[in-house]
Amino acid sequence: MTPLIIGVAGGSGSGKTTVARKIAEAVTPASVAFIDMDAYYRNHVELTLEERRRLNWDHPDAFDFDLLSRQLGALASGEAVEKPIYNFVSHLRDEKTLTIPAADVVVIDGILLFVDERVRERCDVKVFVDTDADVRLIRRIRRDMKRRGRPLEEILDQYLTSVQPMHLQFVEPSKRYADIIVPRGGHNTIAIDLITATILRRLHGSGS
């Protein structure tokens, strides 16, 4: 069976990770590997922590698309990869990596997943999760305060100076590359069921 790569894109806080994980759970008993694009932020060891904090993490230049494309290619060939682990406190990659084994289905999510042509073409099914801006902002605030220990003022400043402008410039336009657009994120169970059915049909077809 040729591995099937499912790409799930959408703005920060859109619910794309929830959608991606629900898809991954629903396609069992096929083996599934899950990858988050955030792991592929560039490793700016040459910068100070303060300089790294000021970087625009929502611009395509923030990501190591070369490495991501190579590793997706390896997974598509049935090989395991060593995925980077990104530390959002130090804004650096950890020395350790995470082994992602070969799998029947590879699900990857990320805000700019469809911006890079090489990565986009690696995805056999492209899903864009479309959620209102106010909902995305609230979710981002909750996530960054709880999981990443960031102060509210810093989160809002980043949203206004980079997250929102980059969403309009890069994320939203990438929606045109999607095969399927999911409104309302992880709450849209009908859309997720339809996506899952499509994936299962393709898996069955590739295995026949």
Question: Which role fits each region the language model picked out?
Answer:
Residues 19:
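Hydrophobic positions on the alpha1 helix immediately C-terminal to the Walker A/P-loop
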Residues 25-33:
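Post-Walker A helix-loop "phosphate-sensing" segment adjacent to the P-loop in P-loop NTPases
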Residues 101-102, 164-208:
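NTP-dependent small-molecule kinase module
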